[in-house]
């Protein structure tokens, strides 16, 4: 209990001082949760995204979306399969992410951003609605990345930006662009001129599914028997951890990845895994470089206090008693 309290206090200190934490894995372990076979006729499983207690599993060609209940990770079950009526070989679904944008206030789900086949350099934006037991999927926008090469996209945690993973024109990189308004059905963005931030990376291997948490991206790479997970600091492009999934028992092609709380769910073609940390805590702290830390003292309520304050204070990450 004492160690948990110390970790909580240190985490609060980092947040107060503008330092972002990355969830890394000191002693990574992989637990197989279940197998749910693909929907008949659906094609190959690609990425998935989680909203609430439901996981949405996407397939290549975007013909089907499976809705899978993940409220209890040891009782995962498929509830429904949506037939999209939008079968398109270009929409590979290599990367999918829910945004925080609702097309209409009473929609059951926010808009979902779906990467097309990498060489098409486009991302589709879909609206999913429900009438009774029936779901309807509507294409509301296509974003064209006119000067990029082999793109996938992820929505950042604020819901205001997209991170574009691209093999060019700056080598392999992530570029951050403002999510465009929905006024036009077709929008062109430039990773050269429209990016508000860009970081170059040195990750090797073919990119698969990815997900963003805080200022870090968790990106799967490789084909069957080659799977790795790269955790990259999006402020610098630094790969802060690389996990060999094959050594942990993952033999398939790593396609799907999403967080549910602190549980990182990874999938291949039908199998569900949980990546977790066998150490005391699964939260390690990674400070962003070149951040100025102001040495302010706080009371236990998180309020700044002066040097004359008497009582228990948090000073430079440590709990002390001033008399």
What are these regions (language model features)?
Residues 34-63:
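Beta-strand-rich domains and repeat architectures in extracellular enzymes and scaffolds
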Residues 36-41, 82-89, 141-147, 197-204, ...:
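Surface loop/turn motifs at the tips and blade-to-blade linkers of beta-strand repeat domains
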Residues 62-69, 119-129, 169-180, 225-232, ...:
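Structural motif
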Residues 252-279:
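Blade-level signature of beta-propeller repeat domains, shared across WD40, Kelch, NHL, RCC1
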Residues 40-51, 89-109, 147-160, 206-213, ...:
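Structural signature of eukaryotic scaffold interfaces centered on beta-propeller domains
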Residues 279-301:
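Residue-level detector of functionally pivotal "anchor" positions at catalytic/ligand-binding pockets or at interdomain
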Residues 194-234:
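Loop/turn-rich, solvent-exposed surfaces of beta-rich toroidal or solenoidal domains
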Residues 238-260:
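Conserved blade-ending motifs and adjacent loop-strand segments that build the rim/top face
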């Amino acid at each position: 209990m004492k160690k948990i309290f110390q970790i909580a206090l240190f985490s609060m200190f980092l947040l107060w001082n503008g330092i972002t934490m990355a969830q890394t894995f000191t002693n990574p372990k992989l637990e197989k949760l279940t197998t749910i076979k693909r929907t008949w006729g659906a094609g190959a499983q690609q990425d998935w995204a989680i909203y609430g207690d439901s996981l949405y599993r996407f397939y290549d060609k975007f013909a089907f979306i499976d809705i899978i209940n993940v409220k209890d990770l040891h009782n995962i079950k498929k509830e429904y399969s949506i037939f999209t009526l939008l079968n398109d070989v270009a929409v590979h679904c290599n990367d999918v992410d829910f945004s925080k944008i609702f097309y209409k206030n009473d929609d059951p789900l926010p808009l979902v951003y779906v990467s097309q086949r990498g060489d098409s350099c486009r991302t589709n934006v879909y609206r999913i609605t429900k009438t009774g037991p029936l779901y309807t999927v509507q294409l509301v926008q296509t974003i064209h990345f006119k000067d990029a090469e082999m793109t996938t996209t992820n929505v950042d945690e604020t819901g205001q930006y997209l991170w574009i993973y691209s093999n060019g024109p700056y080598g392999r990189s992530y570029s951050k662009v403002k999510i465009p308004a929905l006024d036009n059905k077709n929008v062109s963005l430039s990773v050269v001129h429209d990016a508000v931030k860009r970081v170059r990376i040195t990750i090797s291997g073919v990119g698969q599914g990815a997900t963003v948490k805080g200022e870090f991206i968790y990106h799967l790479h490789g084909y069957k028997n080659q799977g790795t997970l790269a955790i990259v600091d999006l402020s610098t492009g630094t790969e802060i951890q690389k996990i060999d999934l094959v050594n942990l028992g993952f033999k398939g092609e790593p396609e799907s990845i999403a967080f549910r709380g602190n549980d990182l769910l990874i999938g291949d073609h039908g199998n569900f895994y949980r990546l977790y940390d066998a150490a005391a805590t699964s939260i390690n702290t990674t400070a962003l470089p070149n951040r100025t830390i102001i040495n302010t003292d706080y009371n236990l309520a998180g309020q700044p206090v002066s040097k004359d304050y008497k009582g228990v204070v948090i000073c430079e990450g440590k709990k002390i008693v001033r008399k």
